[in-house]
């Protein structure tokens, strides 16, 4: 990801919150295999684990955390991961595997949009030296992936049980807002028949990514002058759409942050 200084976000807690607010990541792996493509990507919702002890919180900028997810075994990417584990098990007795090469997980923000040059109310009439662009936000995580796919292993069962419960809880409460009280109560995994859940668990694999680097980008017209940014905000607000209002809000927030530096 191209990171101009004006667009880059390096504050780890903010990037972690971005992931929690936008947990659907795109996992990309590069696994050499005679049976599957080298490069594969899948959309996977992730749970982010970050240190929660006082000592670790003080070092949160140095501790990006861990991402947990699961993939259907029928997914070709999962099959490549299982193939790699099988080759590893031929040499060891381990029921899990951390791949030696990095993987990449990309998280996109909730709003992105084309930006017309007509929004730039200072530069366009003054010089005409403006071109279209696209505003968006994203966070990418690099790290080492561990695969849990031996359905007979107790370690795999425990990982998957925790994963599906934590993911459902986060999605129901933080994303849907089903917190009880005046709001609806959340759906829980225990609401479904236990044998049904156990059957589904046999058809998924678990993945855990130990994050080694987090990078964030908010490309929201910060590179433009104040007058042009004001035009961008007005232009998106006049669209009268949810996406337009979201972009306008972020352009203002990011512009204010730039001006304060």
Curated annotation (Swiss-Prot):
It comes from the Eukaryota. Disulfide bonds: none annotated. It holds the Pfam family FMN_bind_2. Belongs to the PaiB family. This is Uncharacterized protein AFUA_5G13800. It comes from Aspergillus fumigatus (strain ATCC MYA-4609 / CBS 101355 / FGSC A1100 / Af293).
């Amino acid at each position: 990801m191209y990171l101009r200084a004006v667009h880059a976000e390096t504050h780890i807690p903010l990037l972690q919150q971005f992931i929690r607010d936008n947990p659907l990541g795109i996992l990309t792996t590069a696994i050499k295999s005679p049976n599957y493509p080298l490069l594969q990507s899948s959309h996977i919702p992730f749970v982010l684990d970050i240190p929660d002890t006082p000592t670790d919180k003080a070092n949160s900028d140095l501790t990006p955390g861990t991402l947990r997810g699961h993939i259907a075994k029928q997914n070709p990417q999962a099959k490549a991961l299982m193939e790699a584990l099988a080759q590893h098990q031929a040499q060891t007795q381990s029921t899990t595997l951390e791949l030696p090469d990095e993987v990449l997980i990309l998280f996109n923000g909730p709003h992105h949009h084309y930006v017309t040059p007509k929004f730039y109310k200072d530069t366009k009439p003054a010089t005409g030296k403006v071109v279209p662009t696209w505003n968006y936000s994203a966070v990418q995580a690099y790290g080492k992936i561990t695969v849990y796919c031996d359905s007979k292993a107790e370690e795999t069962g425990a990982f998957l049980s925790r994963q599906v419960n934590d993911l459902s809880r986060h999605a129901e409460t933080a994303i849907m807002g089903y917190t009880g009280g005046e709001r609806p109560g959340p759906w829980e995994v225990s609401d479904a028949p236990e044998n049904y859940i156990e059957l589904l668990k046999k058809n998924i694999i678990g993945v855990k990514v130990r994050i080694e680097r987090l990078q964030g980008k908010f490309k929201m017209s910060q590179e433009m002058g104040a007058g042009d940014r004001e035009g961008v905000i007005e232009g998106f607000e006049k669209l009268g759409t949810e996406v337009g209002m979201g972009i306008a809000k972020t352009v203002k927030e990011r512009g204010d942050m730039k001006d304060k530096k």
